[in-house]
Amino acid sequence: MLYNIPCRIYILSTLSLCISGIVSTATATSSETKISNEETLVVTTNRSASNLWESPATIQVIDQQTLQNSTNASIADNLQDIPGVEITDNSLAGRKQIRIRGEASSRVLILIDGQEVTYQRAGDNYGVGLLIDESALERVEVVKGPYSVLYGSQAIGGIVNFITKKGGDKLASGVVKAVYNSATAGWEESIAVQGSIGGFDYRINGSYSDQGNRDTPDGRLPNTNYRNNSQGVWLGYNSGNHRFGLSLDRYRLATQTYYEDPDGSYEAFSVKIPKLEREKVGVFYDTDVDGDYLKKIHFDAYEQTIQRQFANEVKTTQPVPSPMIQALTVHNKTDTHDKQYTQAVTLQSHFSLPANNELVTGAQYKQDRVSQRSGGMTSSKSLTGFINKETRTRSYYESEQSTVSLFAQNDWRFADHWTWTMGVRQYWLSSKLTRGDGVSYTAGIISDTSLARESASDHEMVTSTSLRYSGFDNLELRAAFAQGYVFPTLSQLFMQTSAGGSVTYGNPDLKAEHSNNFELGARYNGNQWLIDSAVYYSEAKDYIASLICDGSIVCNGNTNSSRSSYYYYDNIDRAKTWGLEIS
């Protein structure tokens, strides 16, 4: 069985060296203003700086001081302390996934400085995960539930916005950190330096982690070691009411999985990701217009590349009650290389309107282009030599997905202590398979296949609303409703993937996943306590899951058997979720 690697970290020693005073600059984009030590500003729920106390949704913040003092080996260990947040790794050490309110990581939206980290390889129980250097972080904002029409799809479970450091009020300040993890006999080192010179601000960071096999009461588990490294740069320039920013970052991970086989059923088993790399270039522009109604304009754009190599091997021998066969050895090997290239641009305006209305409007365009190259080998050999068959395959896919969306959110203070937030987002999505070629070799026979070009499209409007009352001392009450929307990934729509001797087919007829979410909450801030509590209920439909093939067209007529495993994606699942959180 696959061994679920525990997330507990045992720290033997920690070194934290302050080069100079650490500066709290808490900015999400170059438009965000500096804040006092008594306030916590958040940006994820309103796409502009606002007090945490006035947030229309359940949100929690891991601030700079917590990150600076943390001796955890990963930011994931800080996230899992938040109620409603669960960290998993799908038995791939170091490949951390975030679940919120029971929803799979593929239904959690990951942002870096408000820019989405898309992952078209996402499946049933895995998404993009944590591919960021924590030494670059100023803070982390976690929104529970899909309560931000301002950021888009994928957020049925919630949103995690990683906000990076962007300069300071000194020429140079920084942190050098080294953590030894006795559970893996591994070290993690990181350094971050930031500062300001005239109208310029900067940040340079880097990290390296080399973790060994995990220690257990029964000894160290083989093949649980992993390694990652990252680098990042921020450059900003401020001129009057204009602010410009450039960010560059890179993160690379290599990992594998441990497999427990006490009965010796497998002669070979391995699941490896020798390379998972994310590279991004982002630009930001903000200006304070300070007109009668129009107050701020924000623009950002980015290019992002995610490359992955996946290698899998399974070899097993089973007895067969036939004198001509006696025993059959089946050996499967798969090697896949895929690359996702993303381009996106966002334009946003902030208005102050009469009758105490604060309006944010904007438009966004995003395109993902994915290429996948795979090679595989499957052999079947009997002990007697009666069966001796080997098939080698190669395939290549190209696909793309484009999204255009318009969004708006308005805060209306219509009476003393009362605030009503209303938001809407309209999507237009288009996905298409532009190329799908395959070839197989069996006993000297060559078979070529070419998939027909396919496409899928959708348009959807999602809404959210929140009503808040703050007429009591140190207490705010809220009631909220929001809709969730997750469009199928390119892998789920078009691609054929192989692992462990099984094949999963895409389904171009998939529908988007939907949810309706309700919440009642209260915040208390007094007597040195800040308490946020919420009761939530969610109804979801059209969840996408993988099913066993039964000879249907989507499976190319293949049927699952004891020797071959075939699956396909379909909309089948519904879910009702409810819970209580106090933090």
Residue positions per predicted region:
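N-terminal Sec signal peptide and the immediately downstream disordered periplasmic leader
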Residues: 1-82, 194-195, 229, 281, ...
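Acidic, small-polar-rich N-terminal luminal/periplasmic segments of exported/outer-membrane proteins
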Residues: 21, 34-170, 185, 485, ...
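Transmembrane beta-strands of outer-membrane beta-barrel pores
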Residues: 178-184, 197-199, 208-212, 239-241, ...
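Transmembrane beta-barrel wall of Gram-negative outer-membrane proteins
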Residues: 180-210, 220-258, 273-290, 294, ...
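Face-selective signature of the C-terminal outer-membrane beta-barrel domain
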Residues: 243-251, 276-443, 452, 457-470, ...
